[in-house]
Amino acid sequence: MERKWWDNCFRAFRVRSVALHMTSLLTSRRDFLRVSGGCLAHVMLMSACASRSTRQRWTAPANPTVTTTPFARLDLIAPDTWAVISTPLGGDRTTYANGGIIAGRNGVIAVEGFYRPAGATWLAERARELTGKWPTHVVLTHYHVDHASGVSGYRAPGGQTPALRATTATRDLAIGGGPVAPPKDDALLRAYADVVIVNATAHSRIDLGNRQVELVPLSGHTKSDVAIVDENADVTFAGDLLWNGMFPNYVDATPTALRASMQQLANRTAHTFVGGHGAVANASAVSRYLGLLDDIERAARTGLTAGRTPAEIAAAYAVPASLGEWMASKAGVERAMTAWARALG
């Protein structure tokens, strides 16, 4: 029965891969190598294994919606704070990842660079409509293509560019042309030429006048992740350290650091959390996610100790029903078990 479920999942993914090709996501061998192990393909593969109702629930709104497009929704999650909830399963991948807007008296933060410049421009225009200001700051949570390749779209019509903030590692990886990084070209290099470096070893702040927004350096999803936290508004943008309703992507992960980073964020139990993919999360959803991370670790340690390969462990793994509904696939689970095998030596 388990084997049949996985086989059906892969058949579904092959069908969806054709759709991806037709929408020009995989337009070349170079593009395929970039996305096949990254979050672009990961999201499509995980969702291919899910029912239509599950796919619809994955990004269901829990907060007032300000605007809806074919590729994303903008929800009000706190005063002067909005979450971008991307809805790529419909076929439009303009933003692809989640992000947001944090507005203050003296400035506006845009969270994430998104997949395409049009996604960044769309968010900047929404910020101007809602706050009267074009973004003054752009903060990247990490370097993956769906979060970092569209930053050039934040250039204002008059030519003014918001301050782009990223850690040194995120900047270097974003322009390094790696397998899951943005495509390296002159436009990308120009967009990253004047990055304001975020401290990767200590918390830093952006002063928006009437609110202080904290940049928390972490790691786990990649070697350098940043969470954006407003303690007064009880809001945390966690990037891909947090996945809601979808099995996380371990392509770059350090599993022990991922768990520790998420626990650090989860201690803010009153916060509204915006993860990198999926609906807005509350403390209960974050607790289920931590439970999933723990169960993945348990399965990996048990299987590896018994001498099984990551593929064998993945083939036998199923998310416990007690953790609720998670979109998952054999490929994603095997990638997680492989990451644990690396971590445990």
Q: Which residues are covered by each model-predicted region?
A:
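Accessory terminal helices/loops
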Residues: 7, 23-25, 42, 54-64, ...
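C-terminal segment of N-terminal export signals and the immediately downstream linker at the start
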Residues: 17, 47-84
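Active-site HxH/HxHxD metal-binding segment of metal-dependent hydrolases
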Residues: 128-207
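Conserved beta-strand hairpin/beta-sheet module of binuclear metal-dependent hydrolase folds
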Residues: 75-126, 227-239
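Metallo-beta-lactamase
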Residues: 107-109, 115-117, 212-302
